Amino acid sequence: GRAQLAGVVRILDVGFGLGVNVAVTLEEIHRQVPDARCEWVSLEKELLPLVDLQEHWGEGKVARDLTELVSKGSFDEEFWSGRILVGDARDSLRSLNGPFDAIYLDPFSPARNPEMWSVEVMRALWEVCEEGGILSTYSSAAKARLALMAAGWEIGLGPRVGRKSSGTVASRGSVDPPLMALEEKQRRSLERRLNEETGINGCDPPSPAAGINSP
């Protein structure tokens, strides 16, 4: 995307938790593109105690950086900057300035936290995503995938971790390489349900021209 060409990668993280997404992603970006700068925004309903963070990460730079980010709400150095917006993510999304190159969607499951897996939230995420950007979530639930499809995302399989089901990866528009396709039977079932379900059926996917980040 444009941000990556400029040497800046912007990432939105819905569900900060212990900061695992932050640490793993920063390490990978720095390994692949040492000169890139990462701008990170996390949305979190309620932060975990600092002691939990420190127990998980122990000593070292990662622990120090994440502790500062959580305790102050922001962090800024040459390689990366971050900020955490605490509160209802649906409200925080309205105040965000996109576009983001990548989005992690890791709130509690659709069964435990259904409001964060609605079509409205998925559309709000679509609107702050760069054209050609990627959304990744651990969830393989039909509810999550249906909401993503209804909001205009292209969806595919995420990587399988151990015995867990593959998560879901979605893109705003086409990407290269393409997403790993769902099984045909699974995709047909989702498309049929998308057409049948009241509420989702009436929510037309936004056209590229409707997105706030269209080029």
Where are these regions (language model features)?
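A short acidic, Gly/Pro-enriched loop at the edge of an enzyme's catalytic core
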Residues: L93-A102
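Conserved beta-strand signature within the Rossmann-like core of class I S-adenosyl-L-methionine
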Residues: A102-Y104, E131-S139
